[in-house]
Amino acid sequence: MTTVLDASAGQGALPFVAPASRWSDEAARGLSAPDLLLYRSNLLGSDLTVTNFGGGNTSAKLAGRDPLTGQEAPVLWVKGSGGDLGSMKLDGFSTLYLDKLLGLEGLYGGVAQEDAMVGYLPHCTFGLNPSAASIDTPLHAYLPFAHVDHVHPDALIALAASSGGEAAARAIYGDQMGWLPWKRPGFDLGLRLRDHVAAHPGLRGVVLAGHGVICWGDDAKACYENTIDLIARAAAYLNARLAQAPAFGGETVAPLAPTDRAQAAAALMPRLRALMIGDRRKVGHFSDDAKTLEFVGGRDFARLAAIGTSCPDHFLRTKIAPMALDPGRLNDDAYLTEAIAGYREGYAAYYERNAGPGDPAMRDANPVVVLVPGIGRFTFAADKTTARLAGEFYANAINVMRGATALGDYLGLADSEAFAIEYWALEEAKLQRMPRPKPLAGRVALVTGAAGGIGAAVAARLLSEGACVMLTDRDAETLEDARRNLTGLFGADPVRASLCDVTDEAQVKAAFAATAREFGGLDILVANAGLASSAPIEETTLELWRKNYDVLVEGYFLASREAFPLMGRQGDGAIVFIGSKNALAATPNASAYASAKAASLHLARCLALEGAAKGIRVNVVNPDAVIRGSKIWDGDWRRDRAGAYGIDPGEELEAFYRNRSLLRRDVLPEDVAEAVLFLVSDAASKSTGNVINVDAGNAQAFTR
């Protein structure tokens, strides 16, 4: 239960973090002018107190040699469209003839031509540079300074989004900071900026209301340190104001304990995800950081959240406003259904109010950000990275609201302006240029026994097709190795790991709860955890018998039991059991193993019957003699199987299995992974209760 408090309780608000200069003369020494621009850009972009991911741009006006005339010409180097300042390389900069850019003013006929003006930018390209120039290019071109930074620091956007922001800017900077009212980026803003700077000599920067700040310097270092200093001074001023009173009207809802927040998130996220209908599946992200909890627990939370985010960089990721939920009604499915339906209706009304004949069709109307007092912030998007970034952008918005309300009233953008940005033709063109999603994009998988050869190969194949994967295994060391390897290949966002012995009911439950909390739900279960034993029946102990059944039958049962409610809620899911040739074909000296595999195969068939009405498909892949990378084949099983056939356990055993197959081919973990991929994909959407043998051909295992 959430705890309601007296709003007058508590101390000052959480502070802003002020940036500090990280410039290194040693690192900068000897760099060329373009490399100095890159160094400065990477420093700025890697500091989240300076700008958000993908936000902001930097420039330098440098001399270049015209490849046709051989004459020296001024060239604007400016961060191109897209990309991220913190991680960009030199090829991320656009290069344009400065004289041609300045000459475009003669073609500009007013704001009605803004979109058309973007089409002229490629005609100014220097050196056949393919990096597309951004809409912010005029802001850099028309300023007379050699080095310019345009960034989106929370501390300065707090000023830019507050009724008291302009007065605060005067108090902080005196005559050193200019102020321009909200205008969309483009030529009009670039020309206004030029004229404002000309009319106010001595400025070090200009606050762009509802947007960010632009500042400059005579060289790369001076520009960087000016930017850092302006942001740090704003943060210090805000912190002095924030220390005087609690943020957001004071706390009225206390956070739950961390473990309770985690449990609530694991329970809520699959239910929300199942209700977010649309053409594309969604992946979730949960955060319960201190700043979010301070915001959602505040007396003014609902009012401020409804105003919406003010900075375009924020709401392009988050939608203009979040959905807020009553923490006391999270177990009420009817309430959740009504809340999401209401949000969609509100978004559709926003679209209808503002859309014109030539605007793009309405996009997904589901909420991106969901806020719950006492619990935290949930974000949903087409993939894990986008969901995480949406959460980070909303955290920026919370910072802005906290600072803005310390100075006056928080100001959001007008409905019409927000719509004009969200459905801007240039933004739509950017979305249309994005690559098509991969076949498993938006899907979440859990793989048991993921540290072994088959499990790791399956996880890698699912990740390669766009899925998020929870790796589980009982061996902590090899599980961490698998996580590290897959993270190196696919990045950290889509990969998680949970230590799990499939024979331990509590650990299985915890792994599925972690999957729901980390990704929002479950679409795919690959039950692969295994072991193998070999012994004549008279030497098979009860302990050995039970061990096989514990892992290969009970372990698959426990995993499936946890998967069913998660998949059933959304009316869709795919389960694949990794079986064995021995499930269909008898083998000597392995009665415990073979009969357990047969039992798990029949369990899969039973589950296919139960799952069909819920949209859950259950199929089996039966491999044989997958030796490479196998933890099972590295142990006693290899020696015992060789002994059963009277052959050497080394290369002779591998040759024996290869030559025993009808196709005379080795079976590799990647071969099994391909079969799994097929069964969990839409290509097999009408397949359930089936068995695919991946054994290079074995007549004994032919299904009958």
Regions found by a protein language model. Give the residues of each.
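Short, small/polar-rich loop/turn modules that mediate ligand/substrate recognition or access, typified
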Residues: 526, 612, 617, 687-689
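Active-site helix of classical SDR
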Residues: 560, 596, 604
